[in-house]
Design a protein with these regions (language model features):
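Extracellular glycan-interacting surfaces
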Residues: 4, 8, 13, 17, ...
Length: 696
């Protein structure tokens, strides 16, 4: 079985995850507040056995949350050290000492992870030395021997008998069978009897790993075993879930039989959970909702909609009617009716992947966030009180990812999605992106300095333009609607420009209809390189549009275009912007480049201590060019006149920044919208990097 997660587009990820080793002169982060939107991916629960209302929640991005009110509200507790993007698929609270917690983690699509231990109720964590670098998919504490922990990893099965201080492999080293261990179960009466669910059938040992036996009678061959649960009162009874369905054994694994009642489309059951007071009641969290049996597996019924992906189930041991679900996309759901109905319970929990951030032009404190990878649980969210409360505003988007947000001159909201441009009409998003007609325009060669006279250069360009018009006429692209990924929406006066996988489009009526493609994804001629347009920027009549390795320019609102010389040394363009003084800024893999002559010459901004630029945007309130980098969590604000800069370290990897009510807000990769704790002070101190620190 290959584990994957949905991610940002590859081009964006290659920038955002470039690394985080950075200059020591920069201050340690003071984490800005994550204010939502609430929800996102929730992975794993654990609760204090002495106080079940204290619940811990693991995520896919190294963070652990805690609730002290049974899951009604959440707060960030700690980020696991060592590296980012750890998937916390195992959380254990020590039954003897609830101040001690254990986390089993891995990195998606990589061989990395380990076991982390906390002795202060989850506030600080240290890695267990014997498990460094292990992809840990399962971690269980033995009920009959509290000092004993068993971990299932990519390599095999590991055991500790001193509460995680030392570990040893108890599966055959280098085994081609007992490896890729996704789930672990331990006999509640015998810590030497261990079940290991692998990506290719389950295994069992009754002598602490000295011998292992495959237990596959009754199972479909090559079944990935995701979860196993043992009846605490009758340990011979066990349920396991596999990609081929749910199975039950009454003989401690000697023979399994497949349970009926769960459709084949929902057979990827990620978790099985038994009611602590009634072992005949079992919950099955699947990729198509929550199922439940109350008669030991004979009859199953679905208690949620089929669009829910359930990762974990919490059942209150004091009151089994209180049930929580950890889900993909929709975060935490709560039921007070033993799963008969659920409501969102995400206050304080935000693991959203925010791709677009927009501050309302007219309403101070109003922020829009465009979310990706959350299907119908995502889309667009709005807050009118600076992030204290959010409302989903996604009607009509039908689960599409939102990569761009813009507000036209009359206040109309536009959303650039994974499939076209949508316009908000006050109650629903409508796809008013019909294209009125093809517009294929000539592109002249890149202009460079030459000893020729201006007149001769203009004559040569005119000849090339006429020849290009003749070739272009045969290649006009007819598009009925904007389709595919919209990478940028830029408002310039009454015009809106959309950079898309099909090319560049323009609207002159606030997004009701569009003209284009002005430049197609395969525009013929002297502009080398076909493909998507990723960035658009401009000032006045001048517009720039960028591909990964090319820039074009129009000085007449897009009527005609010419190619601009590409910065020497830049291998991939990610973003571009224009300052009020007309200077062109380009950000990419090798850093920031600027031009004051429309791309005739370029200067690399080599004093800036970062490369891999993810965003560039002029900020009117700061009167500076604000940029972010995939190298680290720093935000820079550069004065275009003298190239001095100040910086902030919000503690999050961000890729879009806005100023609102005297504070900065930013879109983070997996933690929603983050906001400065309070307004920045006017006084600034010089840092060793040649810029000014805005850190407090």
């Amino acid at each position: 079985m290959k584990l994957k997660r949905m991610r940002f587009p590859l081009a964006l990820l290659s920038v955002l995850f470039a690394g985080s080793c950075f200059h020591a002169a920069f201050a340690a982060p003071t984490f800005w507040s994550s204010v939502g939107p609430d929800g996102g991916d929730a992975r794993r629960f654990a609760f204090d056995p002495h106080d079940p209302s204290r619940i811990y929640l693991g995520t896919t991005d190294s963070w652990i949350y805690v609730s002290n009110d049974g899951g009604s509200s959440w707060s960030r507790l700690a980020e696991l050290p060592s590296r980012e993007h750890l998937v916390i698929d195992s959380l254990v609270v020590d039954r003897e000492d609830p101040s001690t917690l254990y986390a089993g983690v891995y990195v998606m699509d990589q061989t990395d992870g380990g076991v982390f231990i906390s002795h202060d109720r989850g506030r600080t964590w240290t890695p267990a030395e014997g498990m460094r670098g292990q992809s840990v998919f399962a971690l269980v504490q033995a009920a009959s021997a509290p000092n004993t922990f068993v971990a299932g990893t990519l390599k095999g099965v590991y055991r500790s008998d001193d509460k995680g201080l030392h570990w040893r492999e108890i599966s055959p080293p280098g085994s081609r069978e007992v490896h890729e261990v996704q789930s672990i179960a331990i006999d509640p009466n015998d810590a030497n009897t261990i079940y290991a669910g692998t990506w290719h059938l389950p295994w069992k040992t009754t002598d602490n790993g000295a011998h292992w036996n495959g237990i596959k009678d009754g199972l479909i061959d090559d079944s990935d075993v995701f979860s196993m649960v043992i009846d605490r009162t009758r340990p011979t009874i066990m349920f396991l879930s596999a990609c081929s369905g749910i199975y039950k054994t009454d003989s401690a694994g000697q023979l399994f039989h497949k349970v009926q009642g769960i459709p084949s489309t929902a057979r990827r059951t990620r978790v099985l959970m038994m009611d602590p007071k009634d072992p005949n009641t079992v919950y099955a969290g699947t990729t198509e909702g929550l199922y439940k049996t109350q008669d030991g597996g004979t009859v199953w019924s679905r208690t949620t909609g089929p669009d829910l992906i359930v990762n974990d189930v919490y059942i209150d041991p004091r009151n089994p009617r209180h049930v929580l679900l950890a889900t993909d996309r929709s975060g935490v759901l709560a039921s007070e009716s033993a799963g008969a109905g659920f409501i969102s319970s995400n206050t304080g929990f935000s693991q959203r992947q925010v791709a677009a951030l927009l501050a309302d032009n007219s309403h101070e404190g109003t922020i829009y966030a465009g979310v990706i990878n959350d299907k119908t649980y995502g889309g667009v969210f709005v807050t009118k009180d600076f992030g204290r409360t959010w409302k989903q505003r996604s009607e009509g988007l039908d689960g599409r990812d939102v990569f761009e947000l813009a507000q036209t001159s009359d206040g109309t909201l536009l959303a650039g999605t994974s499939d076209g441009v949508y316009r908000w009409n006050g109650g629903v998003w409508t796809r008013d992106d019909s294209v009125t007609g093809p517009v294929t325009v000539p592109v002249a060669p890149a202009h460079t300095r030459s000893s020729r006279t201006r007149e001769s250069a203009q004559m040569r360009q005119a000849e090339l333009r006429r020849a290009e018009e003749e070739r272009a006429a045969a290649h006009r692209v007819h598009v009925s609607a904007i389709q595919g990924h919209v990478t940028a929406l830029v408002v310039m006066g009454d015009a809106v420009y959309a950079a898309t996988a099909q090319g560049l489009f323009r609207s002159m009526n606030h997004g009701v209809s569009w003209q284009g493609p002005m430049l197609g994804a395969s525009t013929p001629g002297v502009f080398a390189g076909a493909g998507s347009y990723y960035a658009v920027a401009g000032e006045g009549e001048t517009i720039f549009a960028g591909r990964r390795q090319g820039i074009v320019m129009s000085e007449n609102h897009g009527a005609t275009w010419k190619s601009v010389s590409f910065p020497t040394g830049l291998t991939a363009l990610h973003t571009l912007a224009v300052a009020p003084d007309g200077s062109l800024w380009v950000g990419g893999r090798e850093g920031v480049y600027t031009s004051t002559d429309h791309g005739l010459t370029w200067t690399r901004f080599d004093k800036l201590p970062v490369t891999d630029i993810t965003s560039l945007a002029w900020n009117n309130k700061l009167q500076r060019m604000v940029l972010t980098s995939g190298q680290d969590s720093l935000i820079f604000a550069v004065d275009p006149a003298d190239k001095t800069w100040k910086w902030w370290n919000p503690g999050w990897m961000v890729h879009s920044v806005a100023a609102l009510q005297g504070r900065l807000v930013a879109a983070s990769m997996f933690s929603g919208v983050v906001v400065q704790p309070q307004p920045e002070q006017a006084s600034l101190s010089l840092n060793s990097g040649g810029g000014q620190s805005a850190q407090r």
